[in-house]
């Protein structure tokens, strides 16, 4: 069974429809992100696209900022998931888990690639401990991503496999792999890292916000044929 797939950076109606038609499990929308990135949507524009997520797919708003701003945006848009990707602290993350759970909105939080950022957000640079802290806070998933606020607009950044494994081996909650995933390397990543979810943005687009059906088909085909490690 292949990992679940999250396609992020959706900006167009036709690309949301493509993802739903191809049975992508999670559709991601970068919305009111706190630093300039080419995929950023206004809350109003995201609100126009979210109702198009159907056929079993779930929606995810990727954002950052203060607890109050994120909470208000989530309650307004009502996605299935909110992904905290703007350097939010563990305390803010835990508060948002509690704030949003009654509305059925679950939280995904990044474990940043830099040790300095992990110390700032979690009080420790140890990636396994960061994962355990997030699990205790009640997040749906920890996202190990090559991107953070400092390089959010950079294309092709690749995740550190050792960082991903340190988090995955420390927790029972879902751990998502993001950063540099494309059809050419996803089989190797699945075989070596065994991610529960792959998070892909630039790996299926011809330019920012323009997804390619051919690239998505190639990614899905590679995922289906990948050999995951035995249980």
Predicted regions and their residues:
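Conserved anion-binding
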Residues: 30-35, 50-62, 68-75, 79-172
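Generic hydrophobic/aromatic pocket-lining and core-packing "Φ" positions
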Residues: 16, 46, 70-71, 131, ...
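Conserved beta-strand positions in the central sheet of alpha/beta enzyme cores
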Residues: 6-9, 26-29, 81-83, 143, ...
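Basic, often amphipathic N-terminal segments
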Residues: 1-54
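A C-terminal functional module that forms or caps the active site or interfaces directly
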Residues: 170-191, 205
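Structural motif
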Residues: 22-24, 76-77, 136-137, 192-193
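Conserved, mostly hydrophobic/aromatic
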Residues: 19, 82, 142, 160, ...
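C-terminal helical cap(s) of enzyme catalytic domains, especially alpha/beta-barrels
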Residues: 42-44, 49-50, 94-100, 201-231
């Amino acid at each position: 069974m292949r990992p679940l797939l999250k396609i992020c950076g959706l900006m167009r109606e036709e690309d949301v429809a493509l993802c739903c038609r191809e049975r992508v499990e999670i559709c991601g929308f970068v919305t009111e992100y706190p630093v300039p990135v080419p995929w950023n949507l206004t809350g109003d524009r995201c609100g126009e696209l979210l109702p198009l997520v159907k056929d079993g797919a779930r929606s995810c708003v990727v954002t950052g900022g203060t607890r109050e701003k994120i909470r208000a945006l989530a309650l307004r848009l009502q996605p299935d998931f909110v992904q905290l990707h703007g350097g939010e602290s563990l305390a803010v993350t835990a508060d948002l888990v509690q704030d949003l759970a009654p509305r059925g909105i679950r939280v995904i939080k990044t474990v940043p690639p830099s040790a300095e950022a992990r110390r700032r957000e979690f009080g420790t640079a140890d990636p396994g401990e960061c994962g355990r802290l997030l699990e205790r806070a009640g997040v749906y998933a920890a996202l190990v991503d090559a991107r953070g606020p400092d390089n959010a607009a950079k294309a092709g950044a690749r995740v550190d496999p050792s960082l991903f494994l340190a988090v995955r081996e420390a927790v029972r909650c879902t751990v998502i792999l993001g950063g540099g995933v494309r059809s050419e390397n996803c089989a190797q990543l699945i075989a070596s890292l065994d991610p529960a979810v792959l998070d892909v943005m630039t790996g299926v687009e011809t330019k920012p916000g323009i997804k390619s059906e051919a690239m998505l088909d190639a990614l899905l085909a590679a995922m289906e044929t990948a050999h995951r490690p035995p249980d």
